[in-house]
Curated annotation (Swiss-Prot):
Biological process (GO), any one: positive regulation of translation
Gene Ontology molecular functions: GTP binding; GTPase activity; ribosome binding; translation elongation factor activity
Organism field: Protochlamydia amoebophila (strain UWE25)
Matches recorded under PANTHER family: TRANSLATION FACTOR GUF1 HOMOLOG, CHLOROPLASTIC (PTHR43512:SF4), TRANSLATION FACTOR GUF1-RELATED (PTHR43512)
InterPro entries tied to this protein: EF-4, EFG_III/V, EFG_V-like, EFTu-like_2, LepA_C_sf, LepA_CTD, LepA_IV, P-loop_NTPase
Keyword Transcription in record: no
Membrane topology designation: Peripheral membrane protein
Matching Gene3D superfamilies: 3.30.70.240, Elongation factor 4, C-terminal domain, Elongation Factor G (Translational Gtpase), domain 3, P-loop containing nucleotide triphosphate hydrolases, Translation factors
Protein name: Elongation factor 4
Family to which the UniProt record says this protein belongs: Belongs to the TRAFAC class translation factor GTPase superfamily. Classic translation factor GTPase family. LepA subfamily.
Enzyme Commission numbers on file: 3.6.5.n1
Swiss-Prot/TrEMBL catalytic activity: GTP + H2O = GDP + phosphate + H(+)
Function statement: Required for accurate and efficient protein synthesis under certain stress conditions. May act as a fidelity factor of the translation reaction, by catalyzing a one-codon backward translocation of tRNAs on improperly translocated ribosomes. Back-translocation proceeds from a post-translocation (POST) complex to a pre-translocation (PRE) complex, thus giving elongation factor G a second chance to translocate the tRNAs correctly. Binds to ribosomes in a GTP-dependent manner.
Keywords annotated in UniProt: Cell inner membrane, Cell membrane, GTP-binding, Hydrolase, Membrane, Nucleotide-binding, Protein biosynthesis
Amino acid sequence: MHCHNLNNIRNFSIIAHIDHGKSTLADRLLELTNTVAARDMQEQLLDDMDLERERGITIKAHPVTMYYKGNDGQTYQINLIDTPGHVDFTYEVSRSLAACEGAILVVDAGQGVQAQSLANVHLALERNLEIVPVINKIDLPAADVEGVRKQIEDVIGLDASDAIGCSAKSGLGVKDVLERILTAVPPPQEPKDNLLRALVFDSHYDVYRGVMVYIRVMSGEIKRGSLIKMMATNKNFEVLEVGMFTPKEKPVEQLRPGEVGYMIANIKTPSDVKIGDTITLQKYPAPEALPGFKIISPVVFAGIYPIDATEFEGLRDALGKLQLNDSALHIEQESSTALGFGFRCGFLGLLHLEIVFERIQREFNIDIISTAPSVIYRFTLDDGVVKTVDNPAHYPDPTFIRMVEEPWVKCHIMIPSEYLGAIMNLGMDKRGVCTKTETMDARRLLLTYRLPLNEIITDFNDKLKSITKGYGSFDYEFDCYEPSEIIKLEIRVNEEPVDAFSCLVHRTKAESKGRAICAKLVEVIPMQLFKVPIQAAIGGKVVARETIRAITKNVTAKCYGGDISRKRKLWEKQKKGKKRMKEIGKVNIPQSAFMEVLKAGD
């Protein structure tokens, strides 16, 4: 059923906020086009990972090719490129959108437009995609279809007068969505020449066949035996197989302009394939690559250590396997005096970090412990050298620092209007600046904030959700680096610095953070036979201190009455013993203490 007429091809993706019904709508489209037999159907069919099904989110971009006979009697090839909806995966979304000519915007009739769908719609509009608004879950009691129509028009600026109402769960109105795709989404453009240009929008590692590259052919054709070249990495390969997703892989003779599918070329190293790269032929290369390619760099860093030191090799293998399918994950080996050997990992954002942690524990059964997440700070030293630091252990000598800069982000926050005061307080507490407040409708506001990235990577989302009873949403994009007073807060246990507890903080928050950590450690470190001071210090100055009391032993218990000097002698002896013990004694910090300190937060 491999028809090739450019006018009969439609490439589109679905944009939606988490839980607005994107994967369910994809399921209904697969059913309606008979792409998947009814017996093979399961919920969220395109979300392969258990984690995706459980969290109800899409992490990888999954394409699928469907064939559909329209009301005009013609058969169309419809390619759906499913995109991740979360802010951490914005670059993956932008590459998936670059492979499309149109996008369906799915909005929940009960919740209305949310921050992350707004961000992705802007990405689609920048690419000049045709956007088809669809209002989902119209059969819910809380559905307000007219209100949501007005919101789409006011907030996003799209004409929603003919937005389709549907219920992806029951299948109501889904046929109308398919017909609208045929009429509203334009077919792929005629290529200007026959040179091969194929956009890489995702890849997947297969243990037996190497890297499977997901591509959209823009011009030319790619078939088995083609000798190809990756334009960004300059690597050459021979194509062993090309095919389409229906939604399982199905080999085909060739992929032609406008088509979406996969390519296998015996690529053994995943880093040879970059998302956003252009594939061309070695013999007749395209003069220029497709626009928009950029190398993604991690934003948030954290140390990962195995709780059981013998599992270090297992952790190395686990991270290596995850990196095969997740090119944005950055890994370096490091060691800590408190935690032993582990890895310093870089992530695109906090959700990305959580997903990696959860996959290590779930898929590889390794219990891990992580240090507090950190961002990249820029230090300008007296000799003009600029140093980037993401780990408190690499903090430069304070006497040589001329200037410190930290990353700031631009943040869009959507909230019900009654929570404005509480969110403003949260913004102030996080050192944020509100630059704009817009009214979306009678009940909701859109706030634009500038915030330091360091302040939002730990608990900003949790606090936003708890203040707004779950109705607030936010997304952010990198803005710029700005000078800031970032200092190293050192935590000492029994006068010894413990690197795993130390962190980089803003000067205004150092004291309160130090107090919180010290108070937490007093609760979780067990009593010793001698007094243990716990201190938070900046440079040489102690800003917070707590003391773990010593276990007291009654050395005079065996003295019945008698002379006081006898008791004094025993007390003095005990005092000397404790002093000596304090000098040579080591404090064992239990593993749970590290977990608790991470939760100590602000």
